[in-house]
């Protein structure tokens, strides 16, 4: 008689995705980040749910309610610290996951990749509206600056901004709707994650060699379930260490001050994981141009599959493009640094050079390097 996990209508879906799934035998630790992102999402959903039970989305009481959570709610300080720092770990895993996709050519699974980019945008939106909720100085001014970017939309821009605000400035209506969005979006992310997996399982996983691995597949359980559990343990150890020993390390000191529309903080900047995009936005001395650059800094990922010129899939045996890949990583780090410093010389020019390099790598240098390597191997 067949096992229940293979016959039950619901269990057989889980079985084909998590137990009997044929996986390449040689996928490395870089393939752990997908499941780590799943763990991050579950952690954020649970901690967020418990925070929402005590939070009030009203400008008079929002800041106080967060203080109340940290002081008076049983383990509220821990739940809040896990949630705030969990977002940082979510983005660390996201960037590692995207970097893995770029390095090993996983973007050639175009549907899976594009849904992944949409997921990335959704998580960024969720994070942004969540950052506004504590209603500190950086929450308020961050919301003001970023929503104001919508005013660059031709003709309807100003109306669009007021529509998002629910009034003539960032006010109570804005906070209330942002809380509603922050509660809703993670479930949308969860739904898109299911689609992401659905499309991935149509093709099967890629692997470090970039060649077809059908001849050498192993079951996901127990091999990769245990491998993933090790990743879970390492990440949770890092998250709890950060949440317990240095919970405010990655936050902004300005957010300990309640929002004040009269006083602007000296440097308005987003959370560290958005600084690279913020640097690209600031590097163009034109509002519309900056907004478009900001948008395309993420959407450029969608064109990567169509600019793949190499006859090989990954970068495992492509030293020239490997070098460019690590230049991209260094460039992202430079942009992250520039996004967090004041707009003055020499930071302005460094940011502009780093921004030009960022787009050049994706749109020009990677495709050129692929063609060069084909020529060197006489594969043209």
Swiss-Prot record:
The chain crosses the membrane at residues 33-53, 77-98, 113-133, 178-198, 226-246, 288-308, 320-340, 347-367. One of its GO terms (cellular component) is respiratory chain complex III. A ubiquinone binds at residue 201. Its cofactor is heme b. It is found in: Mitochondrion inner membrane. GO terms for molecular function: metal ion binding; ubiquinol-cytochrome-c reductase activity. It is a multi-pass membrane protein. Keywords: Electron transport, Heme, Iron, Membrane, Metal-binding, Mitochondrion, Mitochondrion inner membrane, Respiratory chain, Transmembrane, Transmembrane helix, Transport, Ubiquinone. Heme b b562 binds at residues 83, 182. Heme b b566 binds at residues 97, 196. The cytochrome bc1 complex contains 3 respiratory subunits (MT-CYB, CYC1 and UQCRFS1), 2 core proteins (UQCRC1 and UQCRC2) and probably 6 low-molecular weight proteins. Component of the ubiquinol-cytochrome c reductase complex (complex III or cytochrome b-c1 complex) that is part of the mitochondrial respiratory chain. The b-c1 complex mediates electron transfer from ubiquinol to cytochrome c. Contributes to the generation of a proton gradient across the mitochondrial membrane that is then used for ATP synthesis. Heme 1 (or BL or b562) is low-potential and absorbs at about 562 nm, and heme 2 (or BH or b566) is high-potential and absorbs at about 566 nm. Belongs to the cytochrome b family. This is Cytochrome b. It comes from Gadus morhua (Atlantic cod).
């Amino acid at each position: 008689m067949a096992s229940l996990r293979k016959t039950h209508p619901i269990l057989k879906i889980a079985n084909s995705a998590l137990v009997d799934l044929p996986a390449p035998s040689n996928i490395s630790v870089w393939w752990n980040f997908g499941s780590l992102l799943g763990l991050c999402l579950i952690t954020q959903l649970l901690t967020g749910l418990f925070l929402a039970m005590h939070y009030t989305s009203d400008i008079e009481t929002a800041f106080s309610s967060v203080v109340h959570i940290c002081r008076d709610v049983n383990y509220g300080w821990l739940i809040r610290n896990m949630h705030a720092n969990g977002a940082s770990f979510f983005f660390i895993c996201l960037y590692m996951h995207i970097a893995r996709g770029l390095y090993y050519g996983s973007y050639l699974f175009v549907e899976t990749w594009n849904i992944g980019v949409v997921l990335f945008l959704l998580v960024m939106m969720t994070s942004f509206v969540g950052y506004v909720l504590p209603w500190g100085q950086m929450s308020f001014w961050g919301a003001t600056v970023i929503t104001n970017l919508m005013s660059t939309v031709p003709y309807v821009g100003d109306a669009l901004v007021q529509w998002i605000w629910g009034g003539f400035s960032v006010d109570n209506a804005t906070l209330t709707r942002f809380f509603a969005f922050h509660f809703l979006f993670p479930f949308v992310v969860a739904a898109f994650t299911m689609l992401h997996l659905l499309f991935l399982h149509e093709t099967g996983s890629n692997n470090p060699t970039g060649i077809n691995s059908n001849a050498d597949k192993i079951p996901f359980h127990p091999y990769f379930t245990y491998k993933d559990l090790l990743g879970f343990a390492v990440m949770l150890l890092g998250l709890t260490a950060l949440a317990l020993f240095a919970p405010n390390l990655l936050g902004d000191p300005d957010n300990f001050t309640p929002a004040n529309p009269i006083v602007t903080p000296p440097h308005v900047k987003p959370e560290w994981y958005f600084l690279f995009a913020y640097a690209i936005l600031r590097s163009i001395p034109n509002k519309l141009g900056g907004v478009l650059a900001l948008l395309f800094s993420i959407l450029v990922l969608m064109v990567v599959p169509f600019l793949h010129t190499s006859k090989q899939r990954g970068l495992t045996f492509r030293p020239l493009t490997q070098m460019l890949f690590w230049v991209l990583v260094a460039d992202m780090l430079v942009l992250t640094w520039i996004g967090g410093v004041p707009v003055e010389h020499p930071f302005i020019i460094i940011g502009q050079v780093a921004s030009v390099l960022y787009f050049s790598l994706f749109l020009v240098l990677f495709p050129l390097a692929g063609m060069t390597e084909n020529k060197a191997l006489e594969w043209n």
